[in-house]
Amino acid sequence: MSADTRAVNRQMTAFDDRDTVWLFGYGSLLFKAGFDYLECRPARIHGWTRRFWQGSHDHRGTPQAPGRVLTLVQQDDAICEGMAYLIAPRVFDQLDVREKNGYLRLAKTLQFDDGSAADGLVYIATPDNAAWLGEAPLADIAAQVAASTGPSGPNRDYVIHLAEALRALGYADSHVFGIERHLHALERAG
């Protein structure tokens, strides 16, 4: 699959008949939404976990030196905590550009803190996209992150801001926090 998924996502029509749609955010949407929303509240999806396995040559890296950004990967016992944003479908025009580098809009069930649930959409980069980097040791991911900068800024800022946002929400994520620890160690070693 091409790294540019805008055309594929425009064909996602499952929610076209709705005035509003829930969007699940688990990465940069936690610290930099950058779009209009009607409501925002904590949510989670089951069976998925965060991983820095997606390459970024359009935001946090370049084609010659891609950064690493989050995607979700399936894991049966996992729960990914994040934020649900209630948006108007027109917002997807903006989001499809932001998430064009290999991310597909997929329908998932979102669980809320009050026990209720709703169908919604989440952007997930799958292994068949051209920007996929895949699994690597946390220290190697941190080294790549530390060396990468793109139009949206240093890749390290993405990791640090995400870790801060997760802590502010009371969420723990060993993958994100492990990469953050390796980044700080690299900075101390200087």
What are these regions (language model features)?
Residues M1-G190:
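A glycine-rich, hydrophobic/aromatic-adjacent loop/helix-cap motif
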